[in-house]
Amino acid sequence: MSRTSQPMRPRSTPGSGRKTQGRSASAAPTRKIVIAALAGLAVLTAVVVFALRGQGSSDDHTTGDAGNQGFGHVHGIAIDPGSSALHVATHVGLFRIDDPRTAVRVSKDDLDLMGFTVVGPQHFLASGHSAHGPANVGLIESTDGGATWQEKSLSGAADFHGLQVAHGSVYGYNSTDGAFMVSADQRSWEQRSRTAIGAFAVSPIDGGTVLAVGRDGLQRSTDGGRSWQSVPDTPAVGLLAWDRTGVWAVARDGAVWSSTDGGGQWQRRGAVPGEPDSFAVQDDTLFAALSGDRVVASTDGGATWTDRYAPE
């Protein structure tokens, strides 16, 4: 999850259990709204591209372009379980990392990806922005490894700065209104709470347990995000990931921490070799995207790191 998905101040305090679909999330707390799924799924078009650090315009990044690519800030990093390919979601679209010198832009759709998660082989979910409307794309889906994208839900209404698939559901943090939301079918959503959080991670064992980075430190929910409590005596972390071995976190200074009791006790394991943007863990390997278009990996719990992508 991305470092810059900073906690925001909610506009109001809702009740829990609200469901919403489509363009609005403002119904009464106890009211459930289920709107028919969007018809005629369409491939999303190009997005306004933010300026890259030391790079050219978006025209430099066409589908299949490979080599010394600069992709700027990374908002998500994940492995495709089918191909074992490493993917990074950025302000200028989705890139596949083939080797330490080769990054391939996967899609012609210049999507500004703010949230990104992997469902299965070549099956991705994302959120972000599009220049040709809607400005907030809601939840979008790709079933061809990111080559094309289709609308799923909340088009025009949601900008998920955090997404995670766990326990058969999608968990998301909507930056437009501070809503923590969950969907079992990727179309209708239950708003669990409104709270100021950034990165979050769902327990792989218990779908009701969620850790999140709040304004005043780490927050824990034991009811699936409906309520949150502060976790005392924790390091000042900015990025989170959770796998079968425990919780992993990266602090703002790059320090890597781990916890085997759900965030109660923490052990410092090492540090990433740069300023962290995004962080993930899969199959006992830690991945970190760093400022400067660099991606690194660790197989010893963060003690040492090797380059997965480091353009010259």
Give residue spans per PLM region.
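Terminal targeting segments of Actinobacterial cell-envelope proteins
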Residues: 1-30
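C-terminal region of N-terminal signal peptides and the immediate post-cleavage residues
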Residues: 46-68
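Residue-level detector of Asp-centered blade-edge/turn motifs that repeat once per structural unit
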Residues: 79-83, 118-121, 165-168, 204-207, ...
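Asp-box/BNR beta-propeller loop motif
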Residues: 92-106, 138-153, 181-192, 219-230, ...
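Short coil/turn segments at the loop-to-beta-strand junctions that recur within blades
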Residues: 109-114, 155-160, 194-200, 233-238, ...
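Short, solvent-exposed loop/turn segments at conserved positions within beta-propeller repeat blades
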Residues: 131-136, 173-176, 212-213, 251-252
